[in-house]
């Protein structure tokens, strides 16, 4: 779902929260959650989800936090599996993003892992840091601890 919204948002001339929210409300009622098969540190997880977010930090956009317990330096990815809440519960669930406790929703499951694989056999829309791309291969994510070096002059 977040990939669809990223794709549609790229076509909109104005930026900001209002156009983004309009797209979410436009597409949410008719969007069908997808089936996913993941391998999380060697463990297979099969789920149906509205979207899955792979986060190394808490930030999701518009000052929301999809993974409120993610840490940049813990050597782990936070995998956030979001089920589709019934439409009347969408405002309640969405507000948890702003109050930094999204993981408290019964529609959200979180995992921490060093390595994750998403099995994929068809074209899949993916949102990578706000950019929409389509892939047909499996997706693999792996944290390589202490791999970023910052030089300050």
Regions flagged by a language model, labelled:
Residues 1-153:
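Long C-terminal subdomains/extensions of small-metabolite kinases
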């Amino acid at each position: 779902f977040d990939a669809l919204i990223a794709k549609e948002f790229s076509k909109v001339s104005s930026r900001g929260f209002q156009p983004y929210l309009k797209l979410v409300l436009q597409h949410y009622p008719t969007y069908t959650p997808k089936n996913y098969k993941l391998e999380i540190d060697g463990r297979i997880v099969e789920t149906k989800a509205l979207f899955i977010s792979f986060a190394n930090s808490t930030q999701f956009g518009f000052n929301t936090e999809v993974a409120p317990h993610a840490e940049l330096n813990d050597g782990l990815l936070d995998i956030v599996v979001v089920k589709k809440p019934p439409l009347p519960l969408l405002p309640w669930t969405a507000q948890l993003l702003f109050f930094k406790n999204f993981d408290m929703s019964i529609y959200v499951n979180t995992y921490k892992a060093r390595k994750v694989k998403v099995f994929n056999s068809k074209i899949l829309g993916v949102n990578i840091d706000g950019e929409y791309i389509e892939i047909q291969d499996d997706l693999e994510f792996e944290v390589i601890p202490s791999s970023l070096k910052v030089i300050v002059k």
